[in-house]
Amino acid sequence: MIFDVPDPDFARRIRTSFARQGLTETIGATLGRVAAGSVEIGVPFSAGVSQQHGFFHGGVIGAIGDSACGYAAMTLTPAGAEVLTIEYKVNFLSPGQGEQLIARGRVTKPGRTVTVCTGDVFVVSGGQEKLVATMLVTIMTVGGQRDVSPTMPTTPMREIAAHDRSTPSRWCPCRRLRAIKLGFRVVAR
């Protein structure tokens, strides 16, 4: 598929963004091929990315597939734009048992605001690739914002007191969670 590329310097922008991600650094991920509409990310096997049976953890498989798709979408955004995942669905096809994971994300349908991507995650064992997961990822373009950070709230936080079992049941844990989702900051008394 041939895409219009609004930022000819997209590869540098993606490599810079990738280097700032804490999760990818933590799991040892490396950014491979970066092309218009597609990106490849690899993760070597280690105890830190395994689950109890010695396979790659499903969360790691989903995370690198999501990242590969997100960066594939970002290759088609204008300079200064960022991307955020709206949703993704992953189908696990086989246990991730091998030396390395490789995620390949590609744009299926680009859009000005919403882009749909597909991703495949392979495990490499003995030099052979095996498909372990496939996913559908929906990405939102956040135009012109250089830093989209959860540490910089867009709405002011309001404070409420935490439920201490002696307060009325209206502050039970489920209501505290709801209050947090509504932008309240729960504080202990």
Where are these regions (language model features)?
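Non-catalytic linker/capping segments at the edges of enzyme domains
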Residues: 1-42, 150-165, 170-174, 189
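Short, intrinsically disordered C-terminal tails of secreted or membrane-associated proteins
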Residues: 180, 184-188
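Hydrophobic beta-strand-centered segment that forms part of the acyl-chain substrate-binding groove
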Residues: 71-102, 107
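A generic structural signal for short beta-strands and their flanking turns/coil linkers
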Residues: 25-27, 37-39, 82-88, 99-101, ...
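Hot-dog-fold acyl-thioester-processing enzymes
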Residues: 44-68, 157-158
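Residues at secondary-structure transition points
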Residues: 18, 22, 26-29, 51-63, ...
